[in-house]
């Protein structure tokens, strides 16, 4: 084998090893986004919920700042229960539809049903809860104790 071929092979192996350490992206995040859009009839973009209060977005701690933030805490807790059942909620794909009455789930497995129900409950909660701009992108180190 030529030295150049060995270098290419080595580079491919190293890049594959590095890629294996990258955690997978949440696959159902897109589905959750669509459920939110369906529930609130497009009145607020889904990304507005990604960094809201103490629980909407990555992580979560302290006391929820308002009703909308409580929706996110309940959603986090629901995912925690799904994990206890042996499900992987951030990776679980499910079937859902956006009907005239809003979103609904149509899934087959227990994990799909449970995770879709978690997302559906949160999406409907978001739709009925007031959005307070002052709770977007807050300093969680100070307000979420």
Curated annotation (Swiss-Prot):
Residues 1-21 form the signal peptide. Ca(2+) binds at residues 55, 57, 59, 76. Expressed by the venom gland. SMART domains: PA2c. GO terms for cellular component: extracellular region. It holds the Pfam family Phospholip_A2_1. Its EC number is 3.1.1.4. Its cofactor is Ca(2+). Belongs to the phospholipase A2 family. Group I subfamily. D49 sub-subfamily. PANTHER family: PHOSPHOLIPASE A2, PHOSPHOLIPASE A2 FAMILY MEMBER. PLA2 catalyzes the calcium-dependent hydrolysis of the 2-acyl groups in 3-sn-phosphoglycerides. This is Basic phospholipase A2 cL038. It comes from Laticauda semifasciata.
């Amino acid at each position: 084998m030529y030295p150049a071929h060995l270098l290419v092979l080595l580079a491919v192996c190293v890049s594959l090893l590095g890629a294996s350490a990258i955690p997978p992206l949440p696959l159902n995040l897109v589905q959750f986004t669509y459920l939110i859009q369906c529930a609130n009839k497009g009145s607020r973009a889904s990304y507005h919920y990604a960094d809201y209060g103490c629980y909407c977005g990555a992580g979560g701690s302290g006391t929820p700042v308002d009703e909308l933030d409580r929706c996110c805490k309940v959603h986090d807790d629901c995912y925690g229960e799904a994990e206890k059942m042996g499900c992987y909620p951030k990776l679980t794909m499910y079937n859902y539809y956006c009907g005239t009455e809003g979103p609904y789930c149509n899934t087959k497995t227990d994990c799909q049903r449970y995770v879709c129900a978690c997302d559906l409950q949160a999406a409907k909660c978001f739709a009925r809860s007031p959005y307070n701009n002052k709770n977007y992108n807050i300093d969680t180190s100070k307000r979420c104790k």
